[in-house]
Each structure stands twice: as C-alpha cells, then as structure tokens.
C-alpha cells in the first residue's frame, strides 16, 4: 500500500496543468508541509490537515474508481476563516489515512460564487458520474446553489472540474420565500420511485430551522416542494444537513437512494449555529408525502443525540460502495486563540473517518474509527487483568505517548457497584457532572490520563464515573468525561470539560478507546456508543516528555481486564 501511495505522489509532482478559472483544475500535489509547520509540537501525525492555513467543513466525500476523495472548506491565504474567499480544497487517498493534497477543485470565479464557494455534497449519478452541488455566495451576497461536473471521467483523481453554464440552479427570491442569507449546504441527492432526484438544504425562518426540499428530473432544473423535509421551531439555523438511510439489523451501509421499507430507518443530522454542535434524529422517511418523521422520543433540537459530545461540527457522511459502509467525517476546530493559530500558520483538522451504523436498540448511532487506521499501529504494549486500586495511578510504559491508539476494558464487581454513590436528582447535565473539580466518588472517575507530563502538572483525563440511579435502585447511571481543565499550563486556551451519558450496563466490561495525536484526543466509549473529541495544547507534555497513565480516583477498586496500547506511525 505504501508503494502505491508513493507512486501517486510522484505522479502528481510531475503534473502541472494550467487551465481557465471556470475549468477549475489541479496544478499538482500542493507544496509539502513547510518545515516551520511540520515540526510544530501540535501539528498532528495521522489526522488530515492541508499543508497550511485555515480549514473547516468536510465537503463531498466519496469513492470513485477506487480512490477516496475529500473536499473541504479552505482559506488559501491565512489561518483564519474568510468566508468571501473560501475555496473547495481537494485531497485523494487509497486508504482514508494517507492523503495527497491537491489544488482546489472549486474557486470563486462566477457571479454565482464570487464571494465564496461554500459547503455542499457529491452525488453519484446512475451512469457512475459524480457531480457536485455547492452553495455559492453570489455578487449580491445571496446564498445560491450551483453545479459542477468533472471534465474527465477517466481520471480517477478528478483533477478537472467545470462549472455549469446554468448556475445558479436555485436562487432565493420573494416568490419562493427562501431566506437569502440562510440557504446553504445542499445534501447528497437521493433518487425517488417517481424518477425524480431530491436534495435538502439548510435554512432558517425566524427562529425556525428547516430542511428545504427540492426535486428534479435532470439535476439542473429544481422545483421547490410545498413542504420542507422537516423543521422545528426555536432551533435557529440548520447548517450542513445530512440525510441518509441505515439498516435496522446490521452494520452495513446503504446507498443514499436506498428505498424506505420495514428494515430501513433514516437519519437526519443538522449542525446548529446556536450551539456549534451536530445533532441527529432517527426516524421514517415518508416517500409519498416527502417528509421525514422522527421516531417517538426524538426531537430535532438540542435534546437530540450528538455524533460527538466534544469539538466536532459540520459533519458529512458518504456511502462507501466498495466496502458497503457509511463513513462519517467531521471538522475539529482549534481550542487556541486566533493569534496562536496565525502564529503557527494553520487551523482546523478533520477527525479520523468513522464507520457509522444503527445500534441494535434503534435508539442511537454507533461510530468506530475506520479499520484502515490500524495499519499505522507499530509497537504494542499489553496489560492483562491488573487491579487498579482506589486512588492509584499506573503508568503505561513502552508506547509513544503523544501519538498512540489505546483500548482498555474495565470491570467493576457487582459488590462494588452496590457501593456507588447515588446520583443527585438535579444532575441531569453530564457535562456539569464531569466539570466537578477534584471529583472522587465510590466508583470513579477512572480511566486514562493522556498527553500527560511526568509529574502530572498537565494531563487530559478521559474517564468513566458510575452512580446508582436511586437509594434503593439496582439501576446505574454511567457518565463518560473528557476533562481538559488540566490539559495545559497555557492560560489562553479553551479548556472546556466535556461529558455525556453512556448507555451501557456497568455489570459488563466497560470499553474505552482513545486515539491520541499530539493536540487531539478522540475517545470512544462503550464500543462507540458515545464519542468525545478534545483539542489540547500542553506546554510540558510534548514529544518524549509525554506520558500515559491509567488511574482510579474513586474509593472502590476497578479491574483492568485488558489494555492494549500501540505507538502510531504518521500518515503520509
């Protein structure tokens, strides 16, 4: 696989094509990461980042002729967001891990996108031809929807794209009552039984968030449906909507156009600008009425489940037809001040792509890092059945602590579960529970201290706490935390502590997997039932001065059934 990747790089370095603005073209593989950036302590080793400058939303991920493509919102000119100069960055990969960064696929050049080429999606048409629908910020600063097509379908790297002469395809107006300043991020289209394509686009009417629905026979002329696909009052703007089917009985992915039926549910995800978080609901798509109805217990607002309870936004999925899986991408922003981002010359990265599927309960989605990430594993350290006494800390030796993959299984005895503290009636917000300073209860917090300094002046704690649901209750409440409060001695960083309830039985082994990559910590609890991502910037715990610990701050003992920690190579 490495030989294939290096051959691809060599090929791109030899290519240098110059075409017009409208035929938007790759010149070659972009410059290598400058040494003054590459050697920075917070520059990640195996997460995707462009060579420099600002990156945000993932756009139009797909697989075409065996090559994975990732487009993304990118400011070529600096490490801050500039919506009026945003282009579609472009990268390709054979394995979702090692990426070749190409020149932008779409740049502002027409009246319909002259003030920025914003987010959108790829749709694979029945003839196998990929097309992109994206939002352009036009010369009047209206948000309009545009189409681009690949110029050369025989090129698996899709280096040349051409804008449609019909652009813009959809424009807000007094007639259609679409808010011209809140109409963006069209989804991947799905094909209905009536022979029409459908897309939904995020919007806002007052405080009502909605997913506007359009249909088309030819992918050029789009007609607005009388009703939105879905809406909810009081939520504000719905950015980056994503709508896709999931199988009810197994983890295989489904094509976005897969028909509804008794063995299929649908997911609607929206990114709320009010909270800067992604929320999803699970429900039914009524193909006759062209509306989405969330299942009982789901509401498309801040009470809905989240993909990730940390720093994760503007996410986008795609169907990997080769491996029959649905893959999730998400933007992870910085937690450092803007001045620091400018100084280091870059900002933003993408989370490790995750396979996503419906939990057997039908009440949540499960996420797990794509299996390809395991190819970067090298030296392994293993523990077997170690007792983690209350109040103890144990170092994990023999692994490159700043760049690692750690999976641990904890076990708590039934006797000790009976000694868990009773959760307070008002403790309904897990983030507040996790934010309690110097917390120590009967059971927990226990877990990992990652990106830690030798004497633990700095560390990020990824941990579990267990409570009894009531004084006489045999039920338990499990909370998963990612605590950044002690992550750095630097004063100016965002050190928010994140938390979420983890819907598992504590009588069973409790799994916790954490991907550590210098300034990002991605954690997966309960085999992916709950996920939390953090950005941290230690001053002491850098390079060889970084340590990894298992700990138990509770009063009751916890068993480490197994711990596997791998040093991780950097991706190309």
Swiss-Prot record:
GO terms for molecular function: beta-fructofuranosidase activity. Gene3D superfamilies: Exo-inulinase, domain 1, Glycosyl hydrolase domain, family 43. Transmembrane segments: none annotated. The keyword Signal applies. Disulfide bonds join 434-481. It comes from the Eukaryota. It is found in: Secreted, Extracellular space, Apoplast; Secreted, Cell wall. Residues 1-23 form the signal peptide. Its main location: secreted. The active site is at 57. It catalyses: Hydrolysis of terminal non-reducing beta-D-fructofuranoside residues in beta-D-fructofuranosides. Glycans are attached at residues 84, 152, 179, 333, 438. GO terms for cellular component: apoplast. Expressed in flowers, and, to a lower extent, in leaves. InterPro entries: ConA-like_dom_sf, Fructan_Metab_Enzymes, Glyco_hydro_32, Glyco_hydro_32_AS, Glyco_hydro_32_C, Glyco_hydro_32_N, Glyco_hydro_beta-prop_sf. One of its GO terms (biological process) is carbohydrate metabolic process. Pfam families: Glyco_hydro_32C, Glyco_hydro_32N. Coiled coil: none annotated. It is an enzyme of class 3 (hydrolase). Belongs to the glycosyl hydrolase 32 family. This is Beta-fructofuranosidase, insoluble isoenzyme CWINV5. It comes from Arabidopsis thaliana. The lineage of its organism: Eukaryota, Viridiplantae, Streptophyta, Embryophyta, Tracheophyta.
